[in-house]
Amino acid sequence: MKVVLFRDGRPGVAAALPGEAPETELSDLLGGEPDVTPLGTRLELLTLHDAERQQLPIRYSLHRIGRAAEPVAGDAVVVRVGADRNYRDADGNDVEAANCYLRPTGR
């Protein structure tokens, strides 16, 4: 499965996850149980559950129309979701859209 990976305060890049169980792989990638935030109709932001409580650094800010920017602690993954709510491979347009939503803070 192809996702958009945000790591170490850098812009998101396309990354392929090996294997058959994307939910397990995403949990392993983030280091624990993910929180899911919808980004429009076809993308979801996955961040580490309780990342702020674990005192991870704020590396990104989430930008959505009509809302103030929200801090995002630690690394993140953006996944594409189909109409059936199953994960799909992210494409170049998804990478571009994900980088509009999630921006490095420069810290």
For each predicted feature, which ranges?
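Short beta-rich binding modules
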Residues: 1-107
